[in-house]
């Protein structure tokens, strides 16, 4: 069993173990672009996160994160939206979200 830092004991790996796994297996992540829409469904605002890079510069980022083993994509989206935007974000995510696009990242 690995050490954990959260309540999801069996779903987290130690950093060294995770790095080894990333080199051998594909790992599912979700990226989301939060938007605000008006009464007619037209996009009025697009949200990006501001993050500080390792060099101390400000950069923009998407809401994103790993999908846990056995977790539904919708649940992962809601978890990462709440983590990045706070519990009052109140996102409207469809019951069965379909990907807009699929991208492949290489560490």
How would you name each of these model-derived features?
Residues 28-30, 56-58, 96-98:
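A generic structural signal for short beta-strands and their flanking turns/coil linkers
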Residues 33, 50, 103:
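Residues in well-ordered beta-strands of folded domains
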Residues 38, 52, 106:
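Short, flexible active-site-adjacent loop segments at beta-strand->alpha-helix junctions, enriched
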Residues 2-40:
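Acidic, metal-coordinating catalytic segment for phosphate/diphosphate chemistry
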Residues 30, 62-64, 69, 104-107:
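Generic structural "secondary-structure junction" signal
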Residues 8, 13-16, 55-57, 62, ...:
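Residue-level signal for pocket-adjacent positions within structured domains
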Residues 41-90:
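Conserved Nudix-box catalytic region and its N-terminal flanking loop in Nudix hydrolases
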Residues 84-107:
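Active-site segment of metal-dependent pyrophosphate-handling enzymes
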């Amino acid at each position: 069993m690995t050490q954990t830092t959260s309540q999801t004991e069996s779903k987290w790996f130690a950093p060294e173990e995770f790095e080894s796994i990333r080199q051998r297996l594909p790992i599912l992540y979700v990226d989301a672009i939060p938007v605000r829409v008006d009464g007619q469904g037209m996009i009025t605002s697009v949200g990006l996160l501001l993050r500080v890079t390792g060099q101390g510069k400000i950069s923009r980022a998407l809401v994103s994160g790993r999908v846990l083993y056995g977790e539904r994509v919708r649940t992962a989206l809601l978890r990462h939206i709440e983590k990045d935007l706070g519990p009052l974000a109140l996102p409207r995510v469809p019951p069965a979200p379909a990907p807009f696009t699929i991208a492949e990242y290489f560490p």
